[in-house]
Structures are given as structure tokens and as C-alpha cells.
Amino acid sequence: EKNKSLSREVLAVIAVPCWKKEARKDLQERLKKKNGIKILDATECSPLPHPFITHELYNFESEKIVSAIYNCGLSLSKNSNIHLLFIPSYLDGQDGIINMPYYDFLTASDYCIYPSYYEPWGYTPLESIAFGIPCLTTNLSGFGQWVNTQVGHQAILSDGVAVIQRTDNNYEQCACEIAVSIQGLSMLSDLEYIKIQEAARKLSLKAQWKDFIKYYLDAYTLSLKYNATNRQ
């Protein structure tokens, strides 16, 4: 069924490498035939088993992402306005289904979600905004903490990066905040979204190596001094 709170269709992609075997043969066959199938006819094809996943898994029955997909009550019907794609493979351009390098795939996104429970820094959200793709992360990532200091408050979507508060006990709250954030982005006009993209790119320029290298040099200098002192 359609989610009435959404004003447009949403393709939610879970691109997380897992214990995969190989690309799905049945899906590859469908993709080979797609050029010879009229678009209208293609929508009438019967769904594949477990239609959301791109690759075979060694541990399909016990994979937590698969279990969550089936347990959350999300409709996998083609009539739904929320569509799910689970890619359990590294995107190196040769995965057998997507066949596109990660950075090319990234630029096709509208919003990237990195709900870190622990991340000393986090380069993936920085890469996202460098390409002008807004993202969401948490205050438990070094990147999220840095963003908050740069904007002077808990960052929100209009800053180019949304930073939510995550603790040991607020998993459900975070999930709801992420859903609300995605819904909010889906309701933006083209002009509003472009402004957020511009904010994301502008923020990424503050995290270049020419600005950060001094911190690495300071850290290495302190490490060498500490090591020399311990050897005396």
C-alpha cells in the first residue's frame, strides 16, 4: 500500500557489504532482457523472490538486514510508493548487477544516511557532501561533532548535514527522526533542495587536507616526543 505521508515515490537503497556469494542469476537475466522489453510491459513482470536484494547471501536466513526488512512491516508491493534496494556488495564497478563505481553511484543519490553508533571521524558523509549530496549522521561520529562546531548548533538538513543525537537507549527515537528527515526532504521544492546542496558543498570545503593536515602533523609530533621520552 502507498504511504500517504509521502508526496512522491522513494527508492531507499541499503548499500552495505555483507557475506555475499554472487550476483543473482535471475536478476541478471531480467537485466539482460530489459532492452528488449517495452517499459509498460516490464512493469507487468512477476516479481522475483525476495525482490529487494541484488546478490545471493551465504547467510540469507540469519542476515539481520534481511530480517529487519521482513519484520518492519514494509510493503514490498510494486504499488507501494516506498521501494527498497539492498546491495550487499562493494561497488567496484564489477559486482554483476549495479556495475558502477561507488562514486558514480553516490552522485545518483538525493540523501545519504549514516546513523553511526561509533565513528572516530567518518569519511563517507564527507565524501557525500563533497559531491553536493546532503546527508544525515549522528553526534557519535567525529564528523557529526565537527559539523556541529562549524555551524554553531545541532546541525539540521538546511545546513547540508543533519546531525541527530544518538545514545545507548534511543534507537527507536533515532529511527523516527531519520524517517521524519527523509519525509521532509521528499517534500522540498527543486529550489529548496538546490540550496541545501549548495550548503553541503560549502561545508565540505572546510574539511580539505590543506586545513586538516596541521592536526595530523601535531599528532605525529606529539607521538614522536612521547615515544622518545619513554625510551630514555
Where are these regions (language model features)?
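C-terminal alpha-helical cap of glycosyltransferases
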Residues: 209-232
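Alpha-helix termini
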Residues: 1-7, 148-157, 226-227
